[in-house]
């Protein structure tokens, strides 16, 4: 039987992140609402400076902090699986593989970035992180990351998903996060939306506005 799963050992986990910006010398800067390039100062009200520095960095390799690695070791390296049935369905001679990120505590690839983002917030002195989530995957990932790093976490979850996916909410709460249906009466913007559309299912844009 052909091998359908490739599983590396913990010693093979990467110790550095690769920054693709180093190999994209003509990469255009992100633009703000006015159509002009965003400066670090414009991001400072939302993100800590050490994360902003990475956002604009052109350094090719960035060392992964040991505290981050210690958390990632709980499920990484994730297995590489061969999609034999998909190959058969497509009638292709190609070998198709996919990275199985369902093995993470939150069940997706999102803890891979949630953990380092929470870590760098902690290093900067942040005690509480507020975020938004649509269907709940990102909220679950950040709730998990904050639980591992001793941070408070508040998540505004799009109301329709909040109602339809109670187990995602439960998962976030098990990790100590405060999960709130958005729009909510906790923010000025949320109250404005509820007044205009009391039966709104919410949207990711509304949740982002409440979190910010």
Region spans (language model):
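PLP-dependent amino-acid enzyme catalytic core
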Residues: 1-212
